Curated annotation (Swiss-Prot):
Keywords: Antibiotic biosynthesis, Glycoprotein, Membrane, Transmembrane, Transmembrane helix. This is Sordarin/hypoxysordarin biosynthesis cluster protein P. It comes from the Eukaryota. The lineage of its organism: Eukaryota, Fungi, Dikarya, Ascomycota, Pezizomycotina. Its main location: membrane.
C-alpha cells in the first residue's frame, strides 16, 4: 500500500513493536495520537469478549425466534454472519498493524447477507416496545441501507474509509446495550431506555466510523421511511400490503398484539 492510500497513519513495513510505534515518553496528547491508528486492535479484544457469549446464547435460545415470529435459521444466520463480518475486518486490521484495508468482493457479499437478514428480522419483529415503534424500526432500516451504501461506495471508489464506516455500524449492538444500561441509572422506563438505546447507538455508530455525511443521510432516510409508514396506515391497497410485508410499514395486527388502538386519519388531523 502506498503512503497516499494509507489513511490510517500506521507503518507500512517492519515488525510491530510497542516502543517502535508508541512514544511512551511523549505528552498525553502525543501518546494518544500515536496509538490512535491501532484503535482497531484495542477494540477487537473487548468486542469478542462482549459479543461471543451473547451470540452463543442467542443461537442456543430457540424460544427467542418463536417469540418474535421469525425462523430460527434466519436468526442464527444473522448472528453468525454479523460476528464473521466484525471478526474478519478487525482481524485483517490487526494483521496489517492498524492499516485500514479496502473492501473486497467477499466483504461486499458478507455485508449483503448481513443486511438482508437484518431487514428480514425487522420485518418479522412485530412486538417491539410500544414507544416510537415506527422510529425504532426505521432506525434498523437506516442501518442496513447505510451499510449497503457505504460498502457500495467502498467498492466503487476503493476508499477504505467507506468500508470502515460500514463495519462500525455493526458496533450499534454494543452501543445500544451500553446506552440501555446507562439509562437504568435514571428515571427511564424500559420503553424509553429501548428508544434511546436504538436511536443513540446508530448515531454513535456513525461517529465511531466517521461515516461521511452520516447524519444528513440518516435524517433523510428517516423522513422517507416515516412518510412511507404514515401513507400505508389505514390503506388496504396492494402497495400498502406489500410495504407491510416488507417491514417498511406498521403491520395491521401490530396494534392489536400490543394492546393499543390503531391510529385513524381523523385522530391524526385532530392532533395536527
Amino acid at each position: 500500500m502506498s503512503s497516499a492510500n494509507n489513511i490510517s497513519g500506521a507503518p507500512e513495513t517492519g515488525d510491530f513493536t510497542f516502543t517502535q510505534h508508541f512514544n511512551v515518553s511523549a505528552t498525553p496528547s502525543e501518546f494518544l495520537a500515536s496509538i490512535w491508528p491501532y484503535r482497531h486492535m484495542m477494540w477487537i479484544g473487548p468486542m469478542l469478549l462482549f459479543l461471543a457469549p451473547r451470540f452463543y446464547n442467542t443461537l442456543k435460545n430457540t424460544a427467542f425466534s418463536r417469540a418474535y415470529h421469525m425462523p430460527y435459521s434466519i436468526l442464527a444466520l444473522h448472528v453468525f454472519i454479523s460476528f464473521v463480518d466484525l471478526a474478519n475486518y478487525h482481524t485483517q486490521v490487526f494483521l496489517a498493524n492498524g492499516a485500514i484495508h479496502p473492501a473486497s468482493q467477499i466483504d461486499a457479499l458478507i455485508c449483503i447477507v448481513q443486511c438482508w437478514t437484518s431487514l428480514y428480522i425487522t420485518a418479522q419483529h412485530h412486538l417491539l416496545p410500544k414507544i416510537a415503534m415506527e422510529v425504532t424500526r426505521a432506525t434498523f432500516h437506516c442501518m442496513s441501507v447505510q451499510r449497503l451504501f457505504a460498502t457500495a461506495m467502498a467498492i466503487r471508489t476503493g476508499d477504505p474509509r467507506w468500508h470502515e464506516a460500514s463495519i462500525m455500524l455493526l458496533n450499534n449492538f454494543i452501543w445500544a446495550r451500553l446506552l440501555i444500561a446507562y439509562c437504568k441509572m435514571g428515571r427511564f422506563s424500559w420503553k424509553q431506555r429501548y428508544g434511546v438505546g436504538i436511536v443513540g447507538s446508530h448515531l454513535l455508530g456513525m461517529w465511531n466510523g466517521t461515516y461521511p455525511h452520516g447524519i444528513a443521510i440518516y435524517c433523510g432516510l428517516m423522513v422517507v421511511l416515516l412518510n412511507i409508514d404514515g401513507w400505508a396506515k389505514g390503506r388496504d391497497s396492494s402497495v400498502a400490503r406489500a410495504l407491510r410485508y416488507l417491514g417498511l410499514a406498521t403491520p395491521a395486527d401490530w396494534y392489536i398484539k400490543v394492546g393499543i388502538d390503531p391510529p385513524t386519519k381523523s385522530a391524526e388531523k385532530k392532533e395536527a
